Amino acid sequence: DMTSMFSACTVLAELKVPNFNTEKVVSMFGMFANNKALTSLDLSSFNTPEVTTMKGMFSGCSALTSLNISNFNTAKVTDMYGMFFSCEALPSLDLSNFDTEKVTDMYGMFAYCKALKSLKLSSFDTKNVKNMSFMFFYCSSLPTLDLSGFNTENVTDMGAMFKYCLEMEKIDVSKFNTEKVTNMRGMFSGCRKITSLDLSHFNTENVTNTNTMFFSCDALTSLNLSSFKLEKVTDMGSMFFACEEMKTIYCNYTWKCAESTSMFAYCSKLKGAVAYDENKVDVQMANPETGYFTKKTPSGIEKSVDTTEAKIVDIYSLDGKKQTELQNGVNIVRMSNGKIQKIMK
């Protein structure tokens, strides 16, 4: 057990451990935590085949600029909670050798790594991870992040996952499985340079909190939330607060929520079924009929019909029942020119 072994050695500027035998060590929890003066650490000699927890191992090493953990064996590690939390001066991390198959907790793993500009996670196996909240919180210098290999099928908490990634211009979460996620509070809050986000596939059926989810996403001009039903959400407060360049939010659903204070505040360019009104900024405007949402037309469906060329002769529902007028949603129509097509009302 090496738990907190060198923890809080606040004036320790140099540490050399080349002869440490660590092959039977099970816990390295907080081993170097809060060594605020340490600038360089070479742990390339560490053999860690039995270690199960690296929770907070380097947490608070705020002066650390060089860290060699290239030979770490993490095959048995289950807990990486806050492992590099507040390593504020660390410019790069290459964890491409990490085996994370058994890890269940990555809460705040890289939070407050403010100087981090390069982060390699290509080998990360995250299929058993349940908590990714605050994982990249305040990685304010990180310009890009490759999460294409992330398996999030068991994640329940993504709260503040990318919050205050101030320099991030693009985050590819197109492969995220969010079926079990309950918390998305502040997930992209303060991501001021992101110009696009593909969330069209997100499953939000179990989400209960989206408060400040897109707070101050200053560069976003549109969002496709067409899959967002949010039927279980109880807090949508400030969800789109200060999305100053936002013009269009695509969503076909009407949202309802108990708490929605300032939901659309300072979104002056937003327009959906109606133009933006600074006096109407709560969940009552979260709909595509009388609110700020715009309906997303499915591929292959005509949004409207040019009645100057052809007129609607017959209208049918998707189950083949004849209708007297266009219904909300998808309609099958026969035109006066004989053409059969689908249109969305």
Specify the residue positions occupied by each region the protein language model found.
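Negatively charged
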Residues: D1-P298
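Residue-level detector of functionally pivotal "anchor" positions at catalytic/ligand-binding pockets or at interdomain
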Residues: K296-I315, D319
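Extracellular Ig-like/FN3 beta-sandwich strand-entry sites
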Residues: N328-V330
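C-terminal tail/sorting-segment detector
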Residues: I332-K345
